[in-house]
């Protein structure tokens, strides 16, 4: 309804002026609203500071007395209230920016409107001028008419009458023209005034709607803060109720208690007798004034203790420690003690000093005659199992060096050489595994591909360890980099053929090739690849022959694992088909692995992300920004069908934040740490967030789909870090999982690696082809896919297998594995084919799986920005890997 077009007319035509001045009041009201919100933000900020001061007052409460634990409840509640009001201050400041921005836009709109309604202003002025001339013309016409009538009544001459009539006609014509001008100006004014009134009303409606939206944001922010304050008060009341009087008394008694033993009654006779005996002992044990040098040990120094190399008696069994040292007991403790030659009553000598203990070094036994290879291997295994490797090639062992200088016989050199060889093999084997998980040999340990149940996304095998942003690469915080060995193509060590291999493909025994097979360790580490009867040397057109094994590698397998005193590096997480494993297990990395990495410079170039960085030291009371690190880890699950380009894809992600160990002292001290706030940007694709309810706060009223703001509960974060510090006090950094998220991605460009499979199953021949292609548009930044493996299950007896290119056969799991080079935009597609002759009828198609990882980007493109001061981002790590990545025919 046009209110302005109906209510702003009138005789004096002041409606336009009223409307124009009303519109000009819009920027003024906007500025006044900004001033009001700014004053409210100042009040909230002052209140937040007052609550922080109150929290500090509560934290400085006396730790004595039974009421002391309740001060912590007050402190936590005050911190949360201060945080709520501080967050409201931040929201109001953002709202002020929006109001001021709207005020600037309003000024531009008014300037444009003024140019549009200037014609209406001219029409108003013209109508006003015509309205002023019209009464004058009418008055002139009336006067001329009255003069003509007066002359007619006076019977004046005809000449005078003609003059009067002429003047009357001129006045009438002037009045007629004035009326016409007025009507024309009135029509023009009415039309332009109506248009301007409608324009002013539309502007006012837009202005009021925008102002109402700003007021709604203001009210919503205040309401959310009040809801949070209510939750804080409810939590405070619940905490007060949970802390019972009995609990306070028990805590005080346990922490400040002085003991449970009560003083017993005393008997005078027993007490006096005990005092008399004690006095006699003191008198007998009292020594006269003793001058230095009068002691027998000082006057007659004993000869130095000689090292006894004699064999012990056959009838005695001396105590021998684990390193071959025999400790002779102190002679003062023997049952047949030497009779004292001196009086202990008035002796000036210190005869009660403890005697020196004697160390008997067990000599090296005589070499045994030559024995059988089995016995020699067993003895070598027992000897190598007790060895302890030094920390590095340049390290020293002070205990043994001093004893070697004293004449300890040297151990045989063959055992350390063999053990170091085995250690090098195991170290290379450990670093040769996938950086984020084992190969695909363990991807389908419990999967049944014959049914359709294996095609559902019911599990998410994780090749990453979510407990650290860097897994094994990075501790997350600002210190010099140290290269760590990574996976290398030439570090896969083949294993000899297993007894389950077919007779035609079984590898010849080691003895047949002149290689003596040493005994295997009790718990050998699983090898990275198991060629078995189908080795890497498979050629198209012929039967597969076993790959020749390296004799040095075989000898290295004989040595059992060693206990290393070197720095421990976190090893990748083992994949499983159950829930994601979140534990990070340590793995020894010996000096041999480091030397191997130095011998192959390509290690470092291939593992640019495998860099270990030590944590930054955080000095207590430092005024610098505290360093933190974050990691985005995502897992893509995809299911393809035949040659169809579309697929079902789902991505799950996790945000982990890493804190240095020294930050725990800063968080636990005074003043309290600043609130850690951050903003996730580019979150449009994310469908669901699951924040850590104990640590993370968020604003549910945020309407921008591109961003998501969070801030941490500093009290809960401090408590969580303290728990980790208590559980692992030697850790250099601590990881906290803050939130998880997930989203679905339709379309052929939704996954980084497109797969298609085709099976041709006949009675005498089975042919399988797998095609793959790189999709750079699936990631935020195109990055190569590393550790790419394609797995083809073959669950039936077959013969005459042909592969293009060569693949690895796992006999136990009955599957083929193609290990591909890094897949990127350059040469990012290929075709794999396999054919065989089934021995038990036509083959049954099975889903083909893929595994890969990528560093430096994510599929979602989400990023993190710190909000506020007090913290700095040391590192942001981004990576993704496969979960269930399948293609069926």
Curated annotation (Swiss-Prot):
User: Per its record, what are the GO molecular function terms?
Assistant: AP-2 adaptor complex binding
Q: Which CDD domains match?
A: F-BAR_FCHO1
Sequence ranges assigned to domain MHD in this UniProt record: 625-888
Region entry Mediates interaction with the adaptor protein complex AP-2, spans: 267-442
Record's compositionally biased regions (Pro residues):
496-511
What this chain does, per the entry, is described as:
Functions in an early step of clathrin-mediated endocytosis. Has both a membrane binding/bending activity and the ability to recruit proteins essential to the formation of functional clathrin-coated pits. May regulate Bmp signaling by regulating clathrin-mediated endocytosis of Bmp receptors. Involved in the regulation of T-cell poliferation and activation. Affects TCR clustering upon receptor triggering and modulates its internalisation, playing a role in TCR-dependent T-cell activation.
Low complexity composition bias: residue spans = 450-469, 580-596
The record describes its quaternary structure and partners as:
May oligomerize and form homotetramer. Interacts with AP2A2 and AP2B1; 2 subunits of the adaptor protein complex AP-2. Interacts with DAB2. Interacts with clathrin (CLTC or CLTCL1). Interacts with EPS15, EPS15R and ITSN1. Interacts with AGFG1 and CALM. May interact with ACVR1; linking this receptor to clathrin-mediated endocytosis.
User: Tied to what disorder?
Assistant: Immunodeficiency 76: An autosomal recessive immunologic disorder characterized by onset of recurrent bacterial, viral, and fungal infections in early childhood. Affected individuals have T-cell lymphopenia and variable B-cell or immunoglobulin abnormalities. Some patients develop B-cell lymphoma, others manifest neurologic features.
The domain of life is: Eukaryota
Q: Where is this region: Disordered?
A: 294-352, 382-596, 826-849
**Organism expressing this protein natively:** Homo sapiens (Human)
Q: Which residues form the F-BAR domain?
A: 1-248
Where does the record say this protein resides?
Answer: Membrane, Clathrin-coated pit
Q: Where is this region: Mediates membrane-binding?
A: 1-275
- Encoding gene per record: FCHO1
Query: What is the tissue localization of expression for this protein?
Result: Predominantly expressed in lymphoid cells.
Q: List the disulfide bonds.
A: none
Supply the SMART domains for this chain.
FCH (SM00055)
GO terms for biological process?
A: clathrin coat assembly; clathrin-dependent endocytosis; positive regulation of T cell activation; T cell receptor signaling pathway
Q: Describe its membrane topology.
A: Peripheral membrane protein
Its recorded name reads F-BAR domain only protein 1
UniProt keyword terms in alphabetical order:
Coated pit, Coiled coil, Disease variant, Endocytosis, Membrane, Phosphoprotein
Location of region: Mediates interaction with AGFG1, CALM, DAB2, EPS15, EPS15R, ITSN1 and clathrin? 609-889
Q: Which residues form a coiled coil?
A: 156-195
- Phosphoserine is carried by which residues? 295, 347, 372, 530, 616
Question: What is the similarity comment for this entry?
Answer: Belongs to the FCHO family.
One Gene Ontology cellular component annotation held by this UniProt entry? cytoplasm
């Amino acid at each position: 309804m046009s209110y302005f077009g109906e209510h702003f007319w009138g005789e004096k035509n002041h409606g336009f002026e009223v409307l124009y001045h009303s519109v000009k009041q819009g920027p003024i009201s906007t500025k006044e609203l900004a001033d009001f919100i700014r004053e409210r933000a100042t009040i909230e900020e002052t209140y937040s500071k007052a609550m922080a001061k109150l929290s500090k007052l509560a934290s400085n409460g006396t730790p004595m007395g039974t009421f002391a634990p309740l001060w912590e409840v007050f402190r936590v509640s005050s911190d949360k209230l201060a945080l709520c009001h501080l967050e409201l201050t931040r929201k109001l400041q953002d709202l002020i920016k929006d109001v001021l921005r709207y005020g600037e836009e309003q000024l531009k709109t008014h300037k444009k409107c003024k140019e549009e309604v200037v014609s209406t202003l001219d029409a108003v002025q013209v109508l006003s001028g015509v309205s002023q001339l019209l009464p004058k013309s009418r008055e002139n016409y009336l006067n001329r008419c009255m003069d003509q009538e007066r002359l007619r009544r006076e019977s004046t001459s005809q000449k005078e009458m003609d003059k009067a009539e002429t003047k009357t006609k001129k006045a009438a014509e002037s009045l007629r023209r004035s009326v016409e001008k007025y009507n024309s100006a009135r029509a023009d004014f009415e039309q332009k005034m109506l248009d301007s009134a409608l324009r002013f009303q539309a502007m006012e409606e837009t202005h009021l709607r925008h102002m109402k939206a700003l007021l709604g944001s203001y009210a919503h922010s205040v309401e959310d803060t009040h809801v949070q304050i209510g939750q804080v008060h409810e939590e405070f009341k619940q905490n007060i109720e949970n802390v019972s009087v009995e609990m306070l008394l028990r805590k005080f008694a346990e922490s400040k208690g002085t003991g449970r033993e009560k003083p017993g009654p005393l008997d005078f006779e027993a007490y006096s007798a005990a005092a008399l005996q004690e006095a006699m002992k003191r008198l007998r044990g009292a020594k006269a004034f003793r001058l230095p040098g009068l002691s027998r040990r000082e006057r007659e120094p004993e000869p130095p203790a000689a090292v006894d190399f004699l064999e012990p008696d056959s009838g005695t069994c001396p105590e021998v420690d684990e390193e071959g040292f025999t400790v002779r007991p102190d002679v003062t403790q023997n049952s047949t003690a030497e009779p004292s030659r001196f009086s202990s009553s008035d002796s000036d000598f210190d005869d009660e000093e403890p005697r020196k203990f004697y160390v008997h070094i067990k000599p090296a036994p005589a070499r045994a005659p030559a024995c059988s290879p089995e016995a020699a291997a067993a003895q070598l295994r027992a000897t190598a199992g007790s060895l302890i490797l030094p920390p590095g090639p340049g390290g020293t062992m002070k205990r043994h060096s001093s004893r070697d200088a004293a004449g300890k016989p040297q151990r045989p050199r063959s055992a350390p050489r063999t053990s170091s060889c085995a250690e090098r093999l195991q170290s290379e084997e450990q670093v040769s595994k996938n950086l984020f998980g084992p190969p695909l040999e363990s991807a389908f340990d419990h999967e049944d591909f014959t049914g359709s149940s294996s095609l559902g996304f019911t599990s998410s095998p994780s090749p990453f360890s979510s407990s650290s942003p860097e897994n094994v690469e990075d501790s997350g915080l600002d210190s010099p980099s140290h290269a760590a060995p990574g996976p290398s193509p030439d570090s896969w060590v083949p294993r000899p053929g297993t007894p389950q291999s077919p007779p035609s493909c079984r590898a010849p025994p080691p003895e047949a090739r002149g290689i003596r097979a040493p005994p295997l360790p009790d718990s050998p580490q699983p090898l990275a690849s198991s060629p078995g009867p189908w080795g890497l040397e498979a050629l198209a057109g012929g039967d597969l022959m076993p790959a020749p094994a390296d004799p040095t590698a075989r000898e290295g397998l004989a040595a059992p694992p060693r206990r290393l005193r070197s720095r421990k590096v976190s090893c990748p997480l083992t994949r499983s088909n159950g829930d994601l494993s979140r534990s990070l297990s340590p793995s020894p990395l010996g000096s041999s692995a480091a030397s191997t990495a130095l011998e192959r410079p390509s290690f470092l170039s291939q593992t640019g992300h495998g860099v270990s960085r030590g944590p930054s030291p955080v000095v207590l009371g430092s005024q610098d920004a505290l360093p933190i690190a974050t990691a985005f880890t995502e897992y893509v699950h995809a299911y393809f069908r035949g040659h169809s380009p579309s697929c079902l894809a789902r991505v799950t992600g996790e945000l982990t934040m890493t804190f240095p160990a020294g930050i725990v002292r800063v968080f636990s001290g005074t003043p309290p740490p600043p609130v850690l706030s951050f903003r996730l940007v580019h979150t449009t694709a994310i469908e669901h967030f699951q924040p850590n309810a104990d640590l993370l706060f968020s604003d549910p009223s945020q309407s921008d789909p591109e961003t998501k703001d969070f801030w941490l509960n500093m009290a809960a974060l401090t408590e969580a870090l303290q728990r980790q510090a208590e559980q692992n006090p030697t850790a250099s950094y601590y990881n906290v999982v803050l939130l998880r998220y997930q989203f679905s991605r339709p379309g052929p460009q939704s996954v980084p690696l497109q797969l298609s499979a085709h099976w041709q199953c006949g009675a005498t021949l089975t042919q399988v082809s797998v095609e793959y292609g790189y999709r750079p548009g699936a990631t935020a930044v195109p990055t190569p896919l590393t550790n790419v493996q394609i797995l083809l299950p073959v669950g039936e007896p077959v013969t005459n297998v042909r592969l293009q290119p060569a693949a690895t056969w796992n006999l136990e799991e009955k599957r083929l594995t193609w290990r591909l080079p890094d897949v990127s935009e350059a040469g990012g597609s290929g075709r794999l084919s396999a054919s065989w002759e089934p021995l038990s009828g036509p083959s049954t198609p099975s889903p083909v799986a893929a595994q890969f990882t990528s560093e430096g980007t994510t599929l979602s493109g989400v990023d993190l920005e710190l909000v506020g001061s007090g913290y700095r981002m040391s590192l942001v790590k981004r990576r993704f890997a496969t979960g269930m990545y399948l293609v069926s025919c």
